[in-house]
């Protein structure tokens, strides 16, 4: 991420590029793009104008819904037309840009483990899917440990999603449940371990050897 930020000018630009590359068929308002990238609205709008100018994205009209809660009354629903943005598949450098942006290490693996460790006693962390450029994988992250705080992991994952530009598919399991599922050849576990994946942390294997 740091190298790409230097090449492309800012972390926000890289996050927004990934956001559109990972979601090529969706249309987003500048407000939603800013929210998902955890970026300032003004900065986001500036980047979107640059993207449009070079032909990376194109405008599309969308209907935006706003819900306003009112005391002792039904919520007020407002719908308005606004400008949305979507990836322009005719962008001439789409493939090489995608290879560069997506195939570059998304988040340092040691940093990922360090962040997730805030949630409790980690035993196993497996990366698949988006982290190893395997789009067909069932999961992106399998997190195993003892007394894990799911709310903490949820916050960490949300932060990673904003950096990567894609919603992550992940599962959290207590060690005992993981061992049981593995012993009965559970489909979820096999869908991860029988296909390309990368172990970022494996204390379970270390414990076997001791």
Language-model-derived ranges and their functions:
Residues 2-121, 131-136, 146-210:
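Catalytic core of pol beta-like nucleotidyltransferases
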Residues 125-129:
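Regulatory nucleotide-sensing modules
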Residues 138-140:
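Short, solvent-exposed beta-strand edge segments and adjacent coil->beta transition regions
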Residues 142-144:
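Short hydrophobic/aromatic beta-strand micro-patches
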């Amino acid at each position: 991420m740091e190298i790409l930020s230097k090449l492309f000018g800012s972390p926000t630009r890289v996050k927004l590029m990934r956001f559109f590359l990972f979601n090529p068929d969706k249309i987003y308002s500048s407000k939603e793009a800013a929210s998902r990238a955890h970026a300032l609205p003004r900065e986001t709008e500036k980047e979107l104008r640059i993207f449009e100018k070079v032909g990376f994205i194109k405008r599309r009209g969308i209907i935006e819904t706003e819900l306003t809660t009112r005391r002792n009354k039904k919520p007020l629903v407002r719908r308005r037309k606004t400008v949305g943005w979507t990836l322009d598949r005719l962008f001439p450098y789409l493939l090489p840009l995608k290879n560069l942006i997506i195939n570059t290490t998304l988040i340092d693996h040691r940093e990922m483990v360090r962040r997730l460790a805030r949630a409790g006693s980690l035993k196993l962390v497996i990366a698949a899917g988006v982290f190893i450029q395997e789009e067909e994988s069932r999961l992106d992250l399998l997190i195993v440990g003892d007394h894990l705080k799911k709310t903490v992991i949820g916050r960490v994952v949300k932060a990673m999603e904003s950096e990567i530009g894609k919603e992550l598919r992940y599962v959290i399991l207590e060690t005992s449940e993981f061992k049981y599922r593995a012993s009965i050849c559970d489909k979820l576990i096999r869908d991860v371990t029988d296909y390309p994946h990368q172990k970022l942390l494996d204390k379970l294997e270390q414990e076997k050897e001791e």
